[in-house]
Protein backbone atom coordinates (compact mmCIF):
# COMPACT_ATOMS: atom_id res chain seq x y z
CA UNK A 1 0.00 0.00 0.00
CA UNK A 2 1.34 3.43 -0.91
CA UNK A 3 0.55 6.54 1.03
CA UNK A 4 1.23 9.57 -1.14
CA UNK A 5 2.15 12.59 0.91
CA UNK A 6 1.84 15.35 -1.66
CA UNK A 7 3.64 13.14 -4.17
CA UNK A 8 3.01 13.17 -7.88
CA UNK A 9 3.35 9.98 -9.84
CA UNK A 10 6.74 9.41 -11.39
CA UNK A 11 6.93 9.44 -15.18
CA UNK A 12 7.05 5.94 -16.60
CA UNK A 13 8.51 6.58 -20.01
CA UNK A 14 12.08 7.64 -20.58
CA UNK A 15 12.65 10.69 -22.73
CA UNK A 16 15.17 9.62 -25.38
CA UNK A 17 16.61 13.14 -25.40
CA UNK A 18 17.49 12.93 -21.72
CA UNK A 19 21.12 12.14 -21.11
CA UNK A 20 21.58 8.98 -19.09
CA UNK A 21 22.73 9.70 -15.57
CA UNK A 22 23.94 7.46 -12.83
CA UNK A 23 21.21 6.75 -10.34
CA UNK A 24 22.04 7.24 -6.69
CA UNK A 25 20.45 5.63 -3.68
CA UNK A 26 20.69 7.40 -0.33
CA UNK A 27 19.51 4.64 2.02
CA UNK A 28 18.83 4.79 5.74
CA UNK A 29 17.82 1.74 7.76
CA UNK A 30 15.92 2.02 11.03
CA UNK A 31 14.63 -0.46 13.58
CA UNK A 32 11.52 0.05 15.69
CA UNK A 33 11.54 -0.43 19.45
CA UNK A 34 10.00 -3.91 19.16
CA UNK A 35 12.87 -5.23 17.02
CA UNK A 36 15.13 -7.22 19.33
CA UNK A 37 18.76 -8.07 18.66
CA UNK A 38 17.66 -11.64 17.86
CA UNK A 39 15.21 -10.37 15.22
CA UNK A 40 17.83 -7.98 13.80
CA UNK A 41 20.11 -10.96 13.16
CA UNK A 42 17.49 -12.39 10.77
CA UNK A 43 17.02 -9.15 8.80
CA UNK A 44 18.82 -8.18 5.62
CA UNK A 45 21.70 -5.78 6.19
CA UNK A 46 21.96 -2.32 4.60
CA UNK A 47 24.23 -3.43 1.73
CA UNK A 48 21.88 -6.26 0.76
CA UNK A 49 18.82 -4.00 1.04
CA UNK A 50 20.50 -1.56 -1.35
CA UNK A 51 21.37 -4.38 -3.78
CA UNK A 52 17.71 -5.44 -3.84
CA UNK A 53 16.26 -1.92 -4.18
CA UNK A 54 18.66 -0.45 -6.76
CA UNK A 55 17.37 -2.48 -9.76
CA UNK A 56 13.85 -1.23 -8.98
CA UNK A 57 14.86 2.44 -9.24
CA UNK A 58 14.14 4.50 -12.34
CA UNK A 59 15.33 7.71 -10.67
CA UNK A 60 17.75 8.54 -7.90
CA UNK A 61 16.17 7.98 -4.52
CA UNK A 62 16.41 8.92 -0.89
CA UNK A 63 14.75 6.08 0.99
CA UNK A 64 14.40 5.03 4.58
CA UNK A 65 13.66 1.38 5.30
CA UNK A 66 12.22 0.83 8.76
CA UNK A 67 11.72 -2.61 10.28
CA UNK A 68 8.95 -2.65 12.88
CA UNK A 69 7.08 -5.02 15.14
CA UNK A 70 3.40 -5.82 15.21
CA UNK A 71 2.34 -2.92 17.46
CA UNK A 72 4.00 -0.21 15.37
CA UNK A 73 2.84 -1.88 12.16
CA UNK A 74 -0.75 -1.95 13.40
CA UNK A 75 -0.58 1.68 14.61
CA UNK A 76 0.74 2.92 11.26
CA UNK A 77 -1.75 0.90 9.22
CA UNK A 78 -4.64 2.08 11.42
CA UNK A 79 -3.49 5.69 11.37
CA UNK A 80 -2.91 5.99 7.64
CA UNK A 81 -5.14 3.35 6.06
CA UNK A 82 -7.80 3.00 8.77
CA UNK A 83 -7.18 -0.77 8.93
CA UNK A 84 -6.71 -2.19 12.40
CA UNK A 85 -4.09 -4.83 11.63
CA UNK A 86 -0.41 -4.82 10.72
CA UNK A 87 0.44 -5.27 7.04
CA UNK A 88 3.63 -6.54 5.43
CA UNK A 89 4.85 -3.26 3.89
CA UNK A 90 3.71 0.34 3.88
CA UNK A 91 5.21 2.90 1.53
CA UNK A 92 5.13 6.58 2.29
CA UNK A 93 5.93 8.49 -0.91
CA UNK A 94 6.73 12.20 -0.62
CA UNK A 95 7.16 14.99 -3.16
CA UNK A 96 10.28 14.45 -5.23
CA UNK A 97 13.26 16.71 -4.64
CA UNK A 98 13.79 19.55 -7.16
CA UNK A 99 16.31 17.38 -9.03
CA UNK A 100 13.75 14.57 -9.37
CA UNK A 101 15.12 12.41 -6.58
CA UNK A 102 12.39 10.12 -5.26
CA UNK A 103 11.85 10.45 -1.51
CA UNK A 104 10.06 7.80 0.51
CA UNK A 105 9.85 5.58 3.55
CA UNK A 106 9.32 1.82 3.40
CA UNK A 107 8.04 0.26 6.62
CA UNK A 108 8.21 -3.53 6.89
CA UNK A 109 6.42 -5.34 9.70
CA UNK A 110 8.75 -8.22 10.57
CA UNK A 111 6.23 -10.58 12.23
CA UNK A 112 3.88 -10.28 9.25
CA UNK A 113 6.70 -10.80 6.72
CA UNK A 114 7.98 -13.83 8.66
CA UNK A 115 4.51 -15.39 8.92
CA UNK A 116 3.77 -14.83 5.21
CA UNK A 117 7.11 -16.34 4.17
CA UNK A 118 6.48 -19.38 6.37
CA UNK A 119 2.86 -19.81 5.25
CA UNK A 120 3.81 -19.46 1.57
CA UNK A 121 6.84 -21.74 1.83
CA UNK A 122 9.22 -18.99 0.70
CA UNK A 123 12.69 -18.24 1.98
CA UNK A 124 12.56 -15.21 4.26
CA UNK A 125 15.20 -13.40 2.19
CA UNK A 126 13.14 -13.86 -0.99
CA UNK A 127 10.06 -12.39 0.67
CA UNK A 128 11.99 -9.39 2.05
CA UNK A 129 13.53 -8.82 -1.40
CA UNK A 130 10.08 -8.90 -3.00
CA UNK A 131 8.57 -6.48 -0.49
CA UNK A 132 11.49 -4.06 -0.80
CA UNK A 133 11.21 -4.06 -4.60
CA UNK A 134 7.42 -3.69 -4.26
CA UNK A 135 7.81 -0.76 -1.87
CA UNK A 136 10.45 0.94 -4.03
CA UNK A 137 8.11 0.78 -7.02
CA UNK A 138 5.31 2.27 -4.92
CA UNK A 139 7.62 5.12 -3.88
CA UNK A 140 8.04 5.94 -7.59
CA UNK A 141 4.31 6.11 -8.26
CA UNK A 142 3.46 2.57 -9.26
CA UNK A 143 0.18 1.41 -7.73
CA UNK A 144 -1.43 -2.01 -8.08
CA UNK A 145 -4.70 -0.85 -6.52
CA UNK A 146 -5.74 1.69 -9.18
CA UNK A 147 -6.57 -0.68 -12.04
CA UNK A 148 -6.00 -4.20 -13.34
CA UNK A 149 -3.63 -2.78 -15.97
CA UNK A 150 -1.55 -0.97 -13.35
CA UNK A 151 -1.49 -4.11 -11.20
CA UNK A 152 -0.29 -6.21 -14.15
CA UNK A 153 2.41 -3.64 -14.99
CA UNK A 154 3.69 -3.50 -11.43
CA UNK A 155 3.61 -7.28 -11.02
CA UNK A 156 5.54 -7.77 -14.29
CA UNK A 157 8.19 -5.29 -13.15
CA UNK A 158 8.51 -7.06 -9.80
CA UNK A 159 8.86 -10.49 -11.42
CA UNK A 160 11.48 -9.18 -13.88
CA UNK A 161 13.52 -7.35 -11.23
CA UNK A 162 13.42 -10.29 -8.83
CA UNK A 163 14.48 -12.70 -11.60
CA UNK A 164 17.51 -10.48 -12.29
CA UNK A 165 18.31 -10.70 -8.58
CA UNK A 166 18.06 -14.50 -8.70
CA UNK A 167 14.69 -14.88 -6.97
CA UNK A 168 11.73 -16.88 -8.31
CA UNK A 169 8.40 -15.37 -9.30
CA UNK A 170 6.78 -14.42 -5.97
CA UNK A 171 3.28 -14.82 -7.40
CA UNK A 172 3.62 -18.53 -8.23
Curated annotation (Swiss-Prot):
Q: List cofactor names only.
A: Zn(2+)
Q: Which domain of life is it from?
A: Bacteria
Check the record and name the Pfam families matching this protein.
YbeY
**What is any one GO biological process for this UniProt entry?**
rRNA processing
Q: Which Gene3D superfamilies match?
A: Metalloproteases ('zincins'), catalytic domain
- Report the EC code(s) recorded for this entry: 3.1.-.-
Compartments, as annotated in UniProt: Cytoplasm
Give the UniProt keywords, A-Z: Cytoplasm, Endonuclease, Hydrolase, Metal-binding, Nuclease, Ribosome biogenesis, rRNA processing, Zinc
Coiled-coil blocks:
none
EC class of the enzyme, as a word: hydrolase
**Residues reported to bind Zn(2+):** 134, 138, 144
Q: What is its main location?
A: cytoplasm
What InterPro entries does the record tag this protein with? MetalPrtase_cat_dom_sf_prd, YbeY, YbeY_CS
Task: Cite the cofactor comment.
Answer: Binds 1 zinc ion.
Cellular component GO terms, alphabetical: cytoplasm
* GO MF terms held by the record: metalloendopeptidase activity; RNA endonuclease activity; zinc ion binding
**Which HAMAP family does this UniProt record tie to the protein?**
Endoribonucl_YbeY
Kindly give the PANTHER family that the UniProt entry links to this protein: ENDORIBONUCLEASE YBEY, CHLOROPLASTIC
Give the protein's function.
Single strand-specific metallo-endoribonuclease involved in late-stage 70S ribosome quality control and in maturation of the 3' terminus of the 16S rRNA.
**To which protein family does this belong?**
Belongs to the endoribonuclease YbeY family.
Q: What is this protein called?
A: Endoribonuclease YbeY
Amino acid sequence: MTLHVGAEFAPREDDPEDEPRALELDLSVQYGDEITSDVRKTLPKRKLIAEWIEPALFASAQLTVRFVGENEGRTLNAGYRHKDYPTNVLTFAYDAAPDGTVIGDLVLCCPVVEKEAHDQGKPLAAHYAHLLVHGALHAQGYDHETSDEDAAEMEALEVDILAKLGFPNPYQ
